[in-house]
């Protein structure tokens, strides 16, 4: 039996109703497309920046490691023994001409870490011993024997420790101490204070000791140098040391420069025949130039001491350089009494000791010889195992240091 298939006349009504996922109103407009594209672009840029940041961080780490290695290399170069040289001329930012201690000049490379502003003519520099490259700039006073005396290094000599010399004490205090402590007094009067003081006289009369007392009593910086220290082996070193002394004094003003035995470099000029004599004369000319270049507003005073004032160059002695000249003669009777009193103040003298006997003797003796007499008397008492100094001890000391018996020289006849 055949069955006939009956078709549904309305199949569309039997199908489930379907709706599109987005309606026409849900389709993004052109403005939203632009914002979406911009968001994607910014996201890509952010990812690129993050990649760049990681790259920069890695590069920074590498550069820091290289910087540390370069610093260690520079320290290694500067830590090895360096050759001391003198900067002469800058060619460009990377090269210069320097002079070595052997007298030769070199065209060298400058280390990139060196501060170019410190490279001035005559500056002391450190050179690599293999390549002679300029690897360090030394302080101005690094290779100089000139230095300031600190408060603990200053002599403990006071004015009371110097017997006699009352006039000399007053004059040096007026010329050196007073202008540094009460400069306004000279302004009110309308005069310029002395620039320099010359102490001259026989040996042992207290010139150096008085300068020590000035260093003790003043708060100014004190620079002490002996004239023979300026005479160096190589040409130009002496004048450079003179410049260093005055530069150091100006940097630490108020300051006092004491040059002992100045006759070693300040003798009268003559027609020099040797290089050494010409170098000494160049030192003198540099000294004259530095003293002429003094500004009165800079509180720097110069004290010079010598035993031979008659041999000094007249240009140094003229007013304007050494304005005050203080003579230290051999002590007279009153001065000898004061020196004996100072020297024996701490000594254990016997009641029989009469110092006036030694003061009244006509022998011309210096203050240093009086000190030696007292020292010898004390040594003689120690030799005899005594705690009291007797007159015979002083007599022994006097004969030892002053009176020489003629029989001592019969051997040479």
Curated annotation (Swiss-Prot):
Cited InterPro entries: 26S_Proteasome_ATPase, AAA+_ATPase, AAA_lid_3, ATPase_AAA_core, ATPase_AAA_CS, NA-bd_OB-fold, P-loop_NTPase, Prot_ATP_ID_OB_2nd
The protein's name: 26S proteasome regulatory subunit 6B homolog
Keywords, alphabetical: ATP-binding, Coiled coil, Cytoplasm, Nucleotide-binding, Nucleus, Proteasome
One Gene Ontology cellular component: proteasome regulatory particle, base subcomplex
GO terms of molecular function: ATP binding; ATP hydrolysis activity; proteasome-activating activity
Alphabetized Gene3D superfamilies for the sequence: 1.10.8.60, Nucleic acid-binding proteins, P-loop containing nucleotide triphosphate hydrolases
Domain of life where this protein originates: Eukaryota
Record flagged with keyword Nucleus: yes
Coiled coil (residue ranges): 32-80
Entry keyword annotation includes Nucleotide-binding: yes
Gene Ontology terms describing biological process: proteasome-mediated ubiquitin-dependent protein catabolic process
Region (Disordered) residue spans: 1-30
Subcellular location: Cytoplasm; Nucleus
Organism for this UniProt entry: Solanum tuberosum (Potato)
UniProt function note: The 26S proteasome is involved in the ATP-dependent degradation of ubiquitinated proteins. The regulatory (or ATPase) complex confers ATP dependency and substrate specificity to the 26S complex.
Binding annotation for ATP: 201-208
